[in-house]
Amino acid sequence: MRQAIAHAVDQKIIANVVLKQTVIPAYTMLPTHFPGYVGDKHQAYQQFDPNRARQLLNEAGFPNGRGFPKVEMWIGDAGPETVIGQAAQVIQQQLKEVLNIQIAIRNVQGNTYFQRMYAWEIPMSLGGFGYDFPDPQSLLGVVWRSQPKGFTRHDWRNDRFDELIDRAARELDHDTRFGYYDEAEQVLASDVGGVFLWHRLAHDLRKTWVKGIKQDQWGNYPFRGNNTTYYEMYIGDER
C-alpha cells in the first residue's frame, strides 16, 4: 500500500508547479550534493508511475480504491496557504485521481502534532526534516533507524535497514561506510519508509571580502545550516 502511494504522487508537479521551482523533486532521503548522494540510482522506487501505483493497490487488496480505509493526513500548524498546506492538497488530489482513494487533511496545533507523532498515533503525516550535521548518519540513521516509541517519529521498522545503519556507524573505512549507507537508502526507498517529495534549494550571497569559505567537492561554497564552522574564514582587502 505504501508503494502504491509512492508511485501515485507526482513530485515534479509539486516541485515545479505548486512550489514554483523553489525546491527540487525528491525520490530518496539524501539531497543533491549531500555526502553519500548517489544521483538517480534509487529514483525508480518512488517516481511517478500511475499504472504501477494502481497495480500495487490492486495487489494490496483494494482494486480501484474499493475498501480502502479512511485515512487522515496530519499536518502541523500549516494552513492551506502555506507550503505544506498547498502540497497536502495536491497530494490529496493526486491520490484521488490515480488511486481513487480519499485522504482527509487534518491541520493540528504544532505541539499536539509532535506529541501524537512520537506516540505513533498519526497514521499519515506530511512534514520535513533538516540535517543536524553533513553526514548520511544525520538523515538516515537519526531519522529512520528504528527506536522505541517516544524516541522516534514513526513506527517503520526494517531489520536489514537497521543492520546497515549499525554497520556504517562502526565502520572506519570511508568507501565501505558509504556503501552501507547507499544500500540502506535503497532499502528505505524501496520499502517506502516514507514517500519523498522535495528538497529545498538554498541560495547564498556574500561580500567579496569574506574569505576562507572552502569549496566542496561539487564546486559549491556552502555556508548555511550546520556548514558554518570554518576556522580559516577572515575578512580580506577586497571591498
Identify the role of each PLM range.
Residues 3, 7, 12, 16, ...:
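Solvent-exposed, polar/charged alpha-helical surfaces in well-ordered, non-transmembrane soluble domains
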Residues 13-18, 111-144, 188-189:
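Pocket-flanking alpha-helical
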Residues 16-21, 28-29, 83-87, 136-139, ...:
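Short, solvent-exposed loop/turn and secondary-structure capping segments
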Residues 21-24, 30-31, 129-132, 195-203:
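Short, solvent-exposed turn/loop segments enriched in Gly/Ser/Thr/Pro and often Arg
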Residues 25-60, 78-86:
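Structural transition elements
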Residues 35-52, 63-69, 116-120, 141-170, ...:
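Short, solvent-exposed loop/beta-turn-alpha elements that line the ligand-binding surface or hinge
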Residues 58-131, 153, 174, 202:
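Ligand/substrate-recognition segments at binding pockets and active sites
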